[in-house]
């Protein structure tokens, strides 16, 4: 997967017009009651391996992009930092760059970024058991888990952001399919 994920970054920033939907079940953010995994393209799209892989990576954060656009643009929510964690970040720099483009924000990851859900659940368990100061989860993580580890940060490029924005508009336009 590492080679394929890295190859995806050589594709067009807008995935060459290709679109992928990874819905196994319904998705309330996009108003779909049922899931239908789907890959679509038109005859004029740039169908190649790099764009095919990139569209699947984009699809993995498509709904996150739509939800964050609501939070950031409509609700005016501000964040101090976004730290990525989970399988998307297993291949160094790839998921980070994709997510940075999606939400137009720098993304930090730490050495444990690829560990995924079990690691996150263990952190929540530690928070419940070892939170003597009754700190908020954010403060507990900052003080006990991430102390001194700012991680590695990747900022979005203008080309990637513009490409993802084009992709997500095509993605939203194709939802009725």
Q: What are these language model-derived features?
A:
Residues 1-177:
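Glycine/Thr-rich phosphate-binding loops that ligate phosphate moieties of nucleotide
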